[in-house]
């Protein structure tokens, strides 16, 4: 076990740099910063509990794993350290048995950052800084690199702040399996009128993640912001919505799921009794299915994508041809443009 003394300040740094496949099994209590990286083809695995001011995964080509342990830090940064190099990345896997708690999670510091929340692990973001700044408690792409958060069977909780998809870089939240409880998501990037990032729920034929959204909702879905809803479930922790600043061009919500579709459950995910209202201000596109279940109401206030015929060398743009199905609760559609060329099913038919 390693325990930093009183002389250690939060500006001091302890570095682990693996060149083979080392396992760090002892517990670490350190008042300063811990930096870990793995060279190409190698892996550093931590199985002991860690308490520190920060844990930063440096941007090399190897991987850092946390397994059967607890990681408790004020700052968790992935893709950090060294000089600027757009070809490098840092990768952190939270594996089975890991419980991670961080006041701030920030990806893509000085290189690409990848954070995987795998089966049997949990990540909780406890910070409450929800400002539009680099100090935000949950930021997927700080500098001009990509930050990728993959939910792969684990659990993700951030109820005091929204997930900020981008700043100078472009963030991706890819929910394939597992459960996320989020206060919200925000696509506003660093510049005025700049919106970037991607939220991907499952795929066209696979995926079973459940992402529950709170009262902050999913905001600033405009410009280069991307939402693709495939196989999986969107749930409600409160009334929430998907929205954009009307001074800018809205992005569409693309429906991908063609097997069970995207399940939208408006029954409160906590008390399992309160019907919630979920409002989509953005229009729909794609050929997938959106299936409304549970007490509560889905409101479609957006305009579905209309088809655009080919002209000259410009390819045709298909309109929305998917399906919106109401199985339980209520559905409000502003007018026929909310469904466009798509299909509306009531009670399955």
Locations of regions flagged by a protein language model:
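Structured, non-catalytic alpha/beta "coupling" segments that mediate domain-domain communication
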Residues: 224-227, 231-240
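Short, solvent-exposed aromatic-acidic interface loops
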Residues: 217-221
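Catalytic-histidine neighborhood of serine endopeptidases
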Residues: 348-349
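Parallel beta-helix/beta-solenoid repeats that form elongated, surface-exposed shafts/blades used
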Residues: 26, 243-254, 282
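Extracellular repeat-rich scaffold modules on cell surfaces
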Residues: 1-20, 24, 28-77, 81-88, ...
């Amino acid at each position: 076990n390693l325990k930093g003394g009183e002389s250690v300040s939060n500006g001091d740094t302890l570095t682990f740099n693996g060149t083979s496949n080392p396992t760090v099994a002892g517990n670490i209590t350190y008042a300063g910063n811990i930096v870990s990286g793995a060279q190409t083809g190698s892996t550093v695995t931590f199985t002991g509990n860690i308490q520190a001011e920060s844990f930063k995964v440096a941007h090399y080509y190897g991987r850092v794993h946390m397994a059967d342990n607890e990681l408790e830090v004020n700052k968790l940064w992935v893709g950090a350290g060294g000089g600027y190099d757009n070809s490098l990345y840092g990768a952190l896997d939270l594996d089975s048995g890991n419980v991670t708690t961080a006041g701030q999670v920030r990806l893509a510091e000085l290189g690409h950052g990848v954070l995987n929340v795998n089966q049997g692990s949990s990540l909780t973001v406890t910070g409450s800084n929800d400002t539009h700044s680099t100090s935000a408690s949950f930021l997927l792409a700080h500098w001009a690199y990509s930050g990728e958060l993959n939910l792969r069977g684990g659990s993700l909780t951030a109820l005091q702040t929204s997930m900020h998809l981008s700043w100078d870089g472009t963030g991706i939240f890819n929910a394939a399996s597992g459960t996320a409880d989020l206060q919200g998501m925000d696509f506003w990037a660093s510049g005025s009128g700049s919106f970037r990032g991607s939220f991907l729920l499952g795929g066209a034929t696979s995926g079973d993640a459940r992402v529950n959204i709170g009262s902050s909702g999913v905001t600033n879905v405009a410009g280069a912001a991307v939402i693709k809803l495939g196989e999986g479930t969107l749930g409600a922790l409160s009334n929430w919505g998907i929205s954009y600043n009307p001074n800018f061009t809205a992005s569409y919500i693309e429906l991908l799921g063609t097997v069970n579709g995207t399940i939208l459950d408006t029954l409160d995910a906590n008390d399992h009794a309160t019907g919630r209202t979920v409002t989509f201000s953005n229009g729909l596109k794609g050929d997938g299915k959106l299936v409304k279940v549970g007490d509560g109401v889905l409101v479609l206030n957006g305009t579905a994508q209309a088809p655009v015929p080919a002209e000259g060398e410009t390819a045709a743009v298909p309109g929305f041809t998917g399906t919106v199905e109401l199985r339980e609760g209520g559905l409000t559609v502003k007018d026929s443009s909310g469904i466009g060329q798509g299909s509306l099913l009531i009670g399955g038919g």
